[in-house]
Amino acid sequence: MDGAVAAPRERRSLAPSQLAKRKPEGGPCDEEDWRPGAVTPKKRKSSSETQSQECFLSPFRKPLTQLTNRPPCLDSSQHEAFIRSILSKPFKIPIPNYQGPLGSRALGLKRAGVRRALHDPLEEGALVLYEPPSLSAHDQLKLDKEKLPVHVVVDPILSKVLRPHQREGVKFLWECVTSRRIPGSHGCIMADEMGLGKTLQCITLMWTLLRQSPECKPEIDKAVVVSPSSLVKNWYNEVGKWLGGRIQPLAIDGGSKDEIDQKLEGFMNQRGARVPSPILIISYETFRLHVGVLRRGSVGLVICDEGHRLKNSENQTYQALDSLNTSRRVLISGTPIQNDLLEYFSLVHFVNSGILGTAQEFKKHFELPILKGRDAAASEEDRHLGEERLRELISIVNRCLIRRTSDILSKYLPVKIEQVVCCRLTPLQTELYKRFLRQAKPAEELREGNMSVSSLSSITSLKKLCNHPALIYDKCVEEEDGFEGTLDIFPPGYSSKALEPQLSGKMLVLDYILAVTRSCSSDKVVLVSNYTQTLDLFEKLCRARRYLYVRLDGTMSIKKRAKVVERFNNPSSPDFVFMLSSKAGGCGLNLIGANRLVMFDPDWNPANDEQAMARVWRDGQKKTCYIYRLLSAGTIEEKIFQRQSHKKALSSCVVDEEQDVERHFSLGELKELFTLDEASLSDTHDRLRCRRCVNNHQVWPPPDGSDCTSDLAQWNHSTDKWGLKDEVLQAAWDAASTAITFVFHQHSHEEQRGLH
């Protein structure tokens, strides 16, 4: 009976759960409860098993304490201490050579010691913006260690993604805003062309100024970014993209007046070394309306995106920004600084007030001598003085202006192929066009040598007719000026509700481009027009062909724009076409989800077209990009395109609004607008008097080294599909052989790895 009871007890004592009750030999406990002979000896682990455990040990944790070192006869407190020693692991910062403020901080007096830079200046790839002067050991002993300047090093999180030209740009910006390039001046103009990463460079500048300085403390405590309303969300996303959770910007893109005032007051009232939301992102319109709140305190830095809108010092936006209490000002403009002396003065005066003197001093010292020297009747002395003053002006401006062209992108981006496609008008368009020229008052007045400002709005009618007759059908029904008696020209039973692409040369070509692209590739397409009515036609075409599409125009809210763009850029999105109003969202949008873009109609302002065409060929693009600029051959569209390409001061060839046409066109030039050359394959090519073409056929290729930025005379000229690098346009030319008359085409740079 006793043996039967003892056996189960013996078995239980050998179980793993009873390990704590067993005592080692020679222990202080009673020997009768301890039976060493009953304990099975542990199996020795092989060396391979031990090595396998060590191989997968994380570098950021120490090995667990081995259980074999367990002390005998633990009480509860000893046991808890033992478990804590097993689970403990030292914290290790994953950033190499990090010298940040995460170490232990003691209350009380500040401990003496040598000041250190926030980031290691000797680390490989470090971007050092400031290097303190080297001191001898003797000088270091004499100087106060608490006052020694330190290196300013860009955060490695950012410096490792900056390209060489961006590193150079960040250094230039930092030197300008810290008054190291021009003593006493703290502003600069970032005028890089589109796609060179101006936003990233400015974010790097802000983050550096907010975190460090040679004095071992932040240079600024707050920064304000002012941008067009369509880019507020984009700036917010970019800050999050590059800085992650390290900073929380405040973006204001809507709300009531009281709500916005409350947010701005909260932003301005922030104080201390670590401001919770040190970056404010706000639109120009909201800034202008609420500048009173922002004037109540000081701001360390203001950045004005799309800053070319500040070229007029008389407008309210300029004056509101100029009243802000900050000397550090950065103006971003991807648009070329226009060759207008007054604009030079306004922009430079905004960022660095007084560097060019007052407006009167500037006019006397620079403007008048330069203009006088340019005059055709200028004396040799005047011409020499004008050139001298121009060189002086450029030397001053270049100290606070940095501009790099997009040819830098050729190192990082795939090839871009630009194609100017001249399309023949259909018989319906031709007849309507000719009737309008015969009947419209503007044409009649110009033939008589008169020019009426009010009647020049009919230029819009011609431009819309070039897009599609459906856009002027209502004018024909109502028999508006120039379209009297034209209703009978339309086909029997015609209705503008249903789109008929074959009635427009450009729409027919677009229909083929979309169809070939859809059937032969996975490419997506961006369609751009100046008119929302034309976007309506695009919608009808997409619905008829069952293409999935998204549309962005002035009616879409800023929040929804960001969602639409993000969805379209997602590779898994089924959307094929992105319709864009150039007036509503031409600037700042990143549409790298598409690699084909069609400019359906030209704008008077070349900057608007350039902005729109840069939406797809930008950082992050992986495919070869194809840009199509569609023009109706021999019409007003070619005249507009020629004005864009003309080598004149942009102040005299850019027209912002159609009612301003009379300020920029002579009577003879206006007469040319109201003409139609039916026989011309391309009026633009005819005016080039091209020596490389014989009977409109290219015989000699363009000069070596020519690219998209070269003059049209140095592009390829084609009257057939042979020589085109775009297979889609080749196929479209086959299908619409009578619709395409001429193509100018050129690439951004030589291909390195073949077409995608």
Which ranges hold each PLM region?
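ASCE P-loop NTPase motor core, strongest for the SF2 helicase catalytic module
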Residues: 2-33, 47-49, 134-375, 394-412, ...
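Accessory nucleic-acid engagement/destabilization modules that flank
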Residues: 1-149, 157, 266
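A short helix-loop-helix "switch/interaction" segment in the helical subdomain of ASCE P-loop NTPases
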Residues: 379-388, 418-424
